Amino acid sequence: LNLTKWLGKLGVILSHLNK
């Protein structure tokens, strides 16, 4: 499991949602 990759994608999505 590449949690770092997943967390990175999640971070990007959350950033877009926060805007």
From Swiss-Prot:
GO terms for biological process: defense response to bacterium; defense response to fungus; innate immune response; killing of cells of another organism. GO terms for cellular component: extracellular region. GO terms for molecular function: toxin activity. Expressed by the venom gland. Coiled coil: none annotated. It is found in: Secreted. Signal peptide: none annotated. Keywords: Antibiotic, Antimicrobial, Fungicide, G-protein coupled receptor impairing toxin, Immunity, Innate immunity, Mast cell degranulation, Secreted, Toxin. Belongs to the MCD family. Bombolitin subfamily. Mast cell degranulating peptide. May also display antibacterial and antifungal activities. Its mast cell degranulation activity may be related to the activation of G-protein coupled receptors in mast cells as well as interaction with other proteins located in cell endosomal membranes in the mast cells. This is Bombolitin-6. It comes from Bombus lapidarius (Red-tailed bumblebee).
